[in-house]
Amino acid sequence: MSSQYSNVENLSPQTIRQVMRELQEMETTPPEGIKVLINESDVTDIQALIDGPAGTPYAVGIFRVKLTLSKDFPQTPPKAYFLTKIFHPNVAGNGEICVNTLKKDWKPDLGIKHILLTIKCLLIVPNPESALNEEAGKMLLERYDDYSQRARMMTEIHAQPAKCGVGAASDAKDDDGPSTKKHAGLDKKLQDKKKEKLLKEKKRMLKRL
């Protein structure tokens, strides 16, 4: 998914070079559980895949996120969005992410890697006091088991590898070789059957909520 509006022409050549350099470094040496998806024709369209951290309701998921750079970047922070549907206190219905790093704590030298790591940390430690999703924030504080079940259900429905179009962020490769393509059809059929069964189970769970 590419951005509808690009600010690439409004960024200075120095900023564009810096962003591309950082993205290429992350592609070569990715942070654990994070894979950047480089759009070389538009560096203002930054997307990445984040593995759901172990021990959280998001653990089985892979989440696609997007950063949108403004014309004043890096003096002003980018906006960050989850493109994958997620039940989380700090993620609005449109996917916008609320985190202090992208607001009052922003510093021009933080960089793209720091932002993505902060988003991953938000999956581990949500901040219900500054909730964009008030239902999720209230549920986390008052009925954590229900919150965890709801977040896990959303993860299992919306954040599976097939939804992102690739494998896990820690395993995904840029070069899908013949073996990958050969088995893609079979894998998709198995995943579709698994998802169909999972959706039926989740519908039954929702009726009881």
Curated annotation (Swiss-Prot):
UniProt entry tagged with the keyword Magnesium: no
Active site, per annotation: 98 (glycyl thioester intermediate)
GO biological process assignments: anaphase-promoting complex-dependent catabolic process; cell division; exit from mitosis; protein ubiquitination
Top EC group: transferase
Cited CDD domains: UBCc_UBE2S (cd23804)
Family matches, as Gene3D superfamilies: Ubiquitin Conjugating Enzyme
SMART domains tied to this protein: UBCc
Record-annotated UBC core domain positions: 14-160
Family stated for the protein in its record: Belongs to the ubiquitin-conjugating enzyme family.
Function statement: Catalyzes the covalent attachment of ubiquitin to other proteins. Acts as an essential factor of the anaphase promoting complex/cyclosome (APC/C), a cell cycle-regulated ubiquitin ligase that controls progression through mitosis. Acts by specifically elongating polyubiquitin chains initiated by the E2 enzyme vih/UbcH10 on APC/C substrates, enhancing the degradation of APC/C substrates by the proteasome and promoting mitotic exit.
Protein name from the UniProt record: Ubiquitin-conjugating enzyme E2 S
Species this chain originates from: Drosophila persimilis
